[in-house]
Amino acid sequence: MSRISSLQDPFLNALRKEKVSVSVYLVNGIKLQGQVEAFDQFCIVLRNTVNQMVYKHAISTIVPAKSVRMVYSSFNPYHQNSNDEQDENVDDIHSDDLEIQENEGNIHE
């Protein structure tokens, strides 16, 4: 299952590395804003005026303020690639509504 949901970690890591401002919508409708400081399998640390730890199960959508360049492995079955021999795919993720799913992983700082 971790290979299938491998889109989440590269997306969050790109947001963290590029220090992109994000809007995080929770399942209860609350909107949080800030930058992804760190993340692991269960939570995201969102930095604004203070650091907030947000549990992933409470997140509905993460919307970046600008396009994000993302690299992910080609074994993702949900991504169509014209060249199946290619090891990595690079896509621009735009500030459309992006739903994230729970994933296994280590903390990234």
Swiss-Prot record:
Pfam families documented for this protein: Hfq (PF17209)
Presence of keyword RNA-binding: yes
Keyword GTP-binding: no
Residues passing through the membrane, by range: none
GO annotation, biological process: regulation of DNA-templated transcription; regulation of RNA stability; regulation of translation, ncRNA-mediated
Region feature (Disordered): 77-109
Domain of life: Bacteria
InterPro entries assigned to the protein according to its UniProt record, in alphabetical order: Hfq, LSM_dom_sf, Sm
UniProt KW keywords: RNA-binding, Stress response
GO molecular function term, any single one: RNA binding
All copies of domain Sm, residue ranges: 9-68
Any one cellular-component term (Gene Ontology): cytosol
Similarity section: Belongs to the Hfq family.
Summary of the function given for this chain in its UniProt record: RNA chaperone that binds small regulatory RNA (sRNAs) and mRNAs to facilitate mRNA translational regulation in response to envelope stress, environmental stress and changes in metabolite concentrations. Also binds with high specificity to tRNAs.
Quaternary structure (record): Homohexamer.
Descriptive protein name: RNA-binding protein Hfq
Species name: Francisella tularensis subsp. holarctica (strain LVS)
Gene behind this protein: hfq
